[in-house]
Amino acid sequence: SHADLPLKTYQIVNTFRYETKQTRSFIRVREIHFFEAHTAHVDEADATRQIEEDLEIVENLMNELKLPVLVTKRPVWDTFPGAWYTIAIDVVMPDGRTLQVASVHHYRDQWARAFDVTYEDASGNQQYVHQTTYGMSERLLGAIVASHGDDKGLVMPPPVAPIQVVVIPIISKGDSSEVISESERITSELKSAGIRVRLDSRDIRPGQKYYDWEIKGVPLRMEIGPRDLANNSVMCARRTGGKQSHSVDHLVDTVRSELGTIGEEMKKQSSDHFNSRIKMLPAFTINGTDLIFDQAIEKGTVYEMAFDGNDAEAEMIEKGTDLSFLGDSTTAYKKKVPCVITGKPTTRRIFLAKPY
C-alpha cells in the first residue's frame, strides 16, 4: 500500500569474489563487507529526495572523518547495471589515485518492472515502486588509514577514535600512589563526561607506552608526573604534533577543545593534500585520434575539465591521458566554460583520475 511507503531497509552483508587483480588490505579484497540501505518510494521525486538525503549523510560523515571527497555522477558506461544513474564518492589517496568509498543508485521503476514490485495507490490502482540503494564498504577504513596515517602509525579522527584520550602516569622513584590516584581520578572524570579514555598503568617505560599509543593513533596523550601533580596540571600531547601543559581545572572542556583542534589540523592537512592534487587539464591539440598536450600529464594528479562531448570523444580523452572519467561533479561550474573538445560553452565539470 502507498501508506507503507517509503520502505527503508538496512543490511550489512559480506560477499565473495574471485579477485584476479592484486589484492590490497581494505582497498581490493576477496571478501567484501557492504553496508547498504535499500529503499522503495511512491514516485521518482520521492526517490530523488532520498538520494539527496543520502548525499547529505555522506557529507556529514566525511566531515567527521576529516576526508574531503569528490562527488560525481558516473558516466553511462560506469553506471551500476540497471540503475538510472549512479553517484559515487571518491577519496583522493596520498599517491593521487582515487578510491571509491560509497555510492548511491537511483533505479526509477526499472527493477520494479522487471520483478513486478508494485503498491496500491490512493485510488486503488497498482503502481510500480521507485527504488534506490546507498552503500559503503570497508574501503572507507582504508581511506582513513592511508589519508591520515604517518610513519609513526595510525592517526584516528577524534569523532571515530575508539580511544580518544590515553592517560599515562609518569612514575619516578619513591611513592607513586598520589600520581596513580590522580591519574585514576582524571580518567574517571573524563569517562563520566562521555570521553573515550584509557588509563595505561602498565609497568613499562613511558617511552614504550608513547610508542604503543602512537601506533594505534590515539588523538590525545595525557601525561601526569610528580611535577605535574605539584603544579596541579597535566601535559597534553596531540597525535598531530605539539605538547602543552594544562591546568586540571575544567579539564573536560580542555580535552574537548584539544580534540577539536586535532580534528581541525587533520582536516587542514587532508584538504591541503586534496587541493594540491587537483589541476586543470592542460591544453591540447588533436591529431587524428591522438591528443598532443602542451604539458605532460602528471602521475598522481586528478584533472578537471569542462566537457560537453560525446562518448567517442570521452574515450579519446581517456586514451590520451591514460586516466578514467570519474564523471560529472555535483558542483558544476557557476559560469559556462568552453568544452575542451568542442569549444561549446558548458557548466559540466568533469574529473579524470587513476582509480584503485
Predicted regions located by residue number:
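NTP/phosphate- and nucleic-acid-binding module
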Residues: 1-356
